[in-house]
Regions:
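Catalytic machinery of carbohydrate-active enzymes
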Residues: 1-208
């Protein structure tokens, strides 16, 4: 809002409710990476990181429903993403798979989010990418209220989960409020998201 006010003061129209971005145009998104459920287990501080075993449970739940799952990582989070993938494995006979997204810079990560069917993440930049590209999302908040950094209110394609208590966003352990969010709550929130085809939002055509 402050940036919009600054622009308005110089005669430049800016609507704080319009947060959409066009998709990044950087190559082709491989077919097997489109329409996936993206899980992004990392976050800047331990206080905002949901436990890895819960990410594993969500990955398995999605795979059991026949959905492809991509586990993404930011710099320094590759080990966490790999551990989630190894523990989740492949749901036999369901057609669902759990795979690492592989090395991704910011533009590649943005393209994957723009091409995804849905996103699950913590209070991180990936949540803002999902908002910008109109990708349905479930965002897990711990020490910080979604009123500060969450998706815009009133948009049914985004679900912000929060236990209702604030804490230390820089804490060295997962926030107690974040730990109150159970796997079943996240799975139910995913099930309640509208299909991507029913929402507005452009997808990138390319990324390899």
């Amino acid at each position: 809002v402050r940036w919009c006010r600054l622009l308005a003061a110089h005669g430049i129209a800016a609507d704080p409710e319009r947060l959409e971005l066009g998709p990044p145009g950087i190559g082709v998104v491989a077919p097997e990476r489109r329409n996936a459920t993206i899980l992004h287990p990392g976050a800047a501080s331990p206080a905002r990181r949901w436990p890895a075993d819960r990410w594993v449970a969500v990955a398995r739940s999605e795979a059991e429903r026949g959905r492809p799952v991509l586990v993404t990582a930011g710099p320094g989070e590759e080990g966490l993403a790999a551990a989630v993938v190894r523990a989740a494995g492949v749901a036999g006979g369901s057609g669902g798979t759990v795979n690492p997204a592989g090395p991704t810079d910011l533009l590649h990560l943005a393209a994957l989010v723009a091409a995804a069917e849905r996103v699950v993440c913590g209070d991180t930049g990936v949540a803002h990418l999902a908002t910008a590209f109109g990708t349905p999302s479930v965002v897990l908040f711990g020490p910080t209220s979604p009123d500060r950094w969450g998706p815009p209110p009133g948009r049914t394609i985004h679900r912000a989960l929060w236990a209702g208590r604030e804490g230390d966003p820089h804490g060295a352990e997962p926030d107690p409020g974040l730990l109150r969010i159970g796997v079943d709550v996240v799975v139910d929130a995913l099930a309640a998201l509208p299909a991507r085809g029913a929402t507005a939002g452009r997808r990138p055509e390319a990324l390899r």
